[in-house]
């Protein structure tokens, strides 16, 4: 499919920017990935609605991403249109103890905003680099807290290309999952419920949490955080370490010697390097412990 003319048509419908053959490594925290045929940075939710309608009319596949912090894009890239819900949709406002935010805002921004307004419940978000939309899709969490604890409702673009409000009860939240993706819904706005809490206390708890997180997690190399979900009652990192997985390397992809559930990009790692390493770790853990690890990161694109 020739995307140059399609890019021009789409640009006439939206205010955000369109790129052709956009390297996806620029849009993931792993700094890995091939090119997207078409790439849209929407300026608002109407841009997304227009782009989805256009793509469906032209039979162009649609992929929606957030900050790319939990994402591995394969080396062959992504066919069709990639929509990045990002900085054009990152406004955050407050109403009483409720916070409204665009799905492109980042979790740390939400945590800082809540702290400045003396609202508790958002400490878990301080050290997670994901966007709010992406975090809701996977029910992101840390520090004994997660998205579903404080989310109130969201606005989605539904299957009929209409905006719809859904309360969190409609999202079937579970450990690191929701039903947003399987239903083909695109989160564009979010609403969160906090509670009154002393700002100084929030700041101190957040500093302590971030210090512990920094001490326990690798620093200095691109990564996607935890690669595998923790099995019930156990930790993926402990199982991988128990198999001697720390320090294993394929190409420039290496299992961190500090946290075995993290795979680092030492410089020029490819998606194939990471996938080979993932398969090897899964096999090692299953043979040693009888546990089949499940991916927490999402894999997109073509080989």
Curated annotation (Swiss-Prot):
It is an enzyme of class 1 (oxidoreductase). It comes from the Bacteria. Its EC number is 1.3.1.98. InterPro entries: FAD-bd_PCMH (IPR016166), FAD-bd_PCMH-like_sf (IPR036318), FAD-bd_PCMH_sub1 (IPR016167), FAD-bd_PCMH_sub2 (IPR016169), MurB (IPR003170), MurB_C (IPR011601), MurB_C_sf (IPR036635), Oxid_FAD_bind_N (IPR006094). It catalyses: UDP-N-acetyl-alpha-D-muramate + NADP(+) = UDP-N-acetyl-3-O-(1-carboxyvinyl)-alpha-D-glucosamine + NADPH + H(+). Its cofactor is FAD. It is found in: Cytoplasm. One of its GO terms (biological process) is regulation of cell shape. One of its GO terms (molecular function) is UDP-N-acetylmuramate dehydrogenase activity. Disulfide bonds: none annotated. Keywords: Cell cycle, Cell division, Cell shape, Cell wall biogenesis/degradation, Cytoplasm, FAD, Flavoprotein, NADP, Oxidoreductase, Peptidoglycan synthesis. PROSITE patterns: FAD_PCMH (PS51387). One of its GO terms (cellular component) is cytosol. Pathway: Cell wall biogenesis; peptidoglycan biosynthesis. Its main location: cytoplasm. Residues 32-212 form the FAD-binding PCMH-type domain. The active site is at 176, 226 (proton donor), 296. PANTHER family: UDP-N-ACETYLENOLPYRUVOYLGLUCOSAMINE REDUCTASE (PTHR21071:SF4). Belongs to the MurB family. Cell wall formation. HAMAP family: MurB (MF_00037). This is UDP-N-acetylenolpyruvoylglucosamine reductase. It comes from Desulforamulus reducens (strain ATCC BAA-1160 / DSM 100696 / MI-1) (Desulfotomaculum reducens). The lineage of its organism: Bacteria, Bacillati, Bacillota, Clostridia, Eubacteriales. The gene is murB.
């Amino acid at each position: 499919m020739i995307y140059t003319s399609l890019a021009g048509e789409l640009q006439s419908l939206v205010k955000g920017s369109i790129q052709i053959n956009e390297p996806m490594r620029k849009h993931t925290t792993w700094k890995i990935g091939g090119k997207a045929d078409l790439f849209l940075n929407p300026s608002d939710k109407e841009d997304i609605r227009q782009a989805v309608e256009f793509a469906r009319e032209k039979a162009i596949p649609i992929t929606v991403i957030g900050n790319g912090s939990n994402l591995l894009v394969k080396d062959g890239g992504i066919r069709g249109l990639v929509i990045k819900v990002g900085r054009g949709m990152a406004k955050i406002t407050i109403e009483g103890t409720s916070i409204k935010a665009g799905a492109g805002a980042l979790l740390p921004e939400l945590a800082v905003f809540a702290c400045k307004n003396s609202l508790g419940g958002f400490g878990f978000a301080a050290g997670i680099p994901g966007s709010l939309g992406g975090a809701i899709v996977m029910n992101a969490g840390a520090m004994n807290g997660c998205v579903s604890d404080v989310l109130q409702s969201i606005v989605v673009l539904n299957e009929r290309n209409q905006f719809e409000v859904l309360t969190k009860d409609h999202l079937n939240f579970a450990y690191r999952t929701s039903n947003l993706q399987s239903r083909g819904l695109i989160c564009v706005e979010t609403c969160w419920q906090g509670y009154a809490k002393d700002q100084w206390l929030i700041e101190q708890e957040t500093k302590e949490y971030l210090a512990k997180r920094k001490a326990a997690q690798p620093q200095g190399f691109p990564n996607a955080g935890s690669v595998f979900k923790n099995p019930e009652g156990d930790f993926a990192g402990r199982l991988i370490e128990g198999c001697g997985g720390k320090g294993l390397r394929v190409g420039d992809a290496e299992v961190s010697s500090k946290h075995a559930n993290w795979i680092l990009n030492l410089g020029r790692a490819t998606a194939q390097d990471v996938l080979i390493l993932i398969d090897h770790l899964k096999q090692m853990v299953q043979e040693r412990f009888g546990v089949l690890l499940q991916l927490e990161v999402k894999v997109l694109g073509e080989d």
